[in-house]
Amino acid sequence: MNLHEYQGKQIFAKYKLPVSQGIACKTADEAVEAIKQLKGDAWAIKCQVHAGGRGKAGGVKLVRNEAEVREFADKWLGKRLVTFQTDANGQPVNTLYVEETAGIARELYLGAVIDRSSQKVVFMASSAGGMNIEEVAAKTPELLHKVAIDPLVGGMAYQGRELAFKLGLTGDQIKQFSFIFTQLAKLFVEKDLSLLEINPLVVTTEGNLLCLDAKMVVDGNALYRQPELAAMHDPSQDDPREALAESHQLNYVALDGNIGCMVNGAGLAMGTMDIVKLHGGFPANFLDVGGGATKERVAEAFKIILSDKAVKAVLVNIFGGIVRCDLIADGIIAAVNEVGVNVPVVVRLEGNNAELGREILAKSGLNIIAAATLTDAAVEAVKAAGGK
């Protein structure tokens, strides 16, 4: 689950991390009132969306008076911001964050992720702050420094000092950075995060460190023990189809293609998407109905796929292990009868009750293309969607 920048900074403040004073605003009037409460003669006003690249897309601006604040608020509130990390529709802007500014001498990067191979939290720091960190890693890997956190002892001050030296920090900045590092390591574990980024972490013209941004992603599997963070969830940033799928215990991710995919098992779902791409097609989604799929859940999955108007064909690929293929067949028929289908449906059933499932579909009178193998299914789906 993603958090907004202003929410992340609220949490940072509780961990005594250096952040600018700021106010989250829902209306233009609130934004105008905010600059009256904040210090300084210039302020940063930022669109709050779950995506990076806001600055380049015009979603961040330095403002100096009430007129500029109101102009920015009127331009963005209730609109959608499109960045390189969003789809063509962008993300809705319902909140603006107005904060005090500071003179910037240097921009650094500091972030943390879970490294599955080492089974540890790994912190990354770079002197190339304010840039896309993936680009830094690809083009100038020597500027990216890493340190792994021992889960038994947590982040240690000496690790922070080592990173500070590599970043070229001096004097009291080293002490400041070490404190920020150890507090972030503590925060990462205590809040069950899967990703944490400060980009940029700046050195101000006064020589102090300041967290100018805050990106936090909470492990969705841990939300049951993070009620404070769960309450921060902003459903307006979610794809409505993904939210609906979650309510039916379906794993769904919307994509940009035109071949809807319904599969049981995440691995098989990814393999199905790969083979569709291999044969020249473009998946419209990732959808895993799970091992305990019921007739009702399959019907809902089918309806969610068909709600995407870009879908030109549907590929159903089921390997019956725990889930029974005849239940899948019943669910497909129920969904087709309820929603109505005007696109070709390609079905490949294998495993538990596969023969019965195929028989049910054959007797249904529906226009379904049966496939014996996964390759055949992918080829037929691409052809049905208008591909080669």
Curated annotation (Swiss-Prot):
Catalyzed reactions per annotation: succinate + ATP + CoA = succinyl-CoA + ADP + phosphate; GTP + succinate + CoA = succinyl-CoA + GDP + phosphate
This protein's UniProt keywords: ATP-binding, Ligase, Magnesium, Metal-binding, Nucleotide-binding, Tricarboxylic acid cycle
Gene Ontology BP annotations: succinyl-CoA metabolic process; tricarboxylic acid cycle
EC numbers on record: 6.2.1.5
Gene3D superfamilies per record: ATP-grasp fold, A domain, ATP-grasp fold, B domain, Succinyl-CoA synthetase domains
Molecular function, one GO term: succinate-CoA ligase (ADP-forming) activity
Free-text cofactor note: Binds 1 Mg(2+) ion per subunit.
Pfam families noted in UniProt: ATP-grasp_2, Ligase_CoA
Annotated ATP-grasp domain residues: 9-244
UniProt keyword Hydrolase present: no
InterPro entries found in the cross-reference section: ATP-grasp_succ-CoA_synth-type, ATP_grasp_subdomain_1, Succ-CoA_synthase_bsu_CS, SUCC_ACL_C, Succ_CoA_ligase-like_bsu, Succinyl-CoA_synth-like
Transmembrane portions of the chain: none
Binding residues annotated for substrate, in chain numbering: 264, 321-323
Enzyme class: ligase
Pathway assigned in UniProt: Carbohydrate metabolism; tricarboxylic acid cycle; succinate from succinyl-CoA (ligase route): step 1/1
Cofactor: Mg(2+)
Residues engaged in binding Mg(2+): 199, 213
SUPFAM superfamilies documented for this protein: Glutathione synthetase ATP-binding domain-like, Succinyl-CoA synthetase domains
Binding site for ATP: 46, 53-55, 99, 102, 107
Family: Belongs to the succinate/malate CoA ligase beta subunit family.
Function: Succinyl-CoA synthetase functions in the citric acid cycle (TCA), coupling the hydrolysis of succinyl-CoA to the synthesis of either ATP or GTP and thus represents the only step of substrate-level phosphorylation in the TCA. The beta subunit provides nucleotide specificity of the enzyme and binds the substrate succinate, while the binding sites for coenzyme A and phosphate are found in the alpha subunit.
NCBIfam families the UniProt entry points to: PRK00696.1, sucCoAbeta
Binding partners and assembly: Heterotetramer of two alpha and two beta subunits.
Protein's UniProt name: Succinate--CoA ligase [ADP-forming] subunit beta
Organism per entry: Glaesserella parasuis serovar 5 (strain SH0165) (Haemophilus parasuis)
Organism lineage string: Bacteria, Pseudomonadati, Pseudomonadota, Gammaproteobacteria, Pasteurellales
Name of the encoding gene: sucC
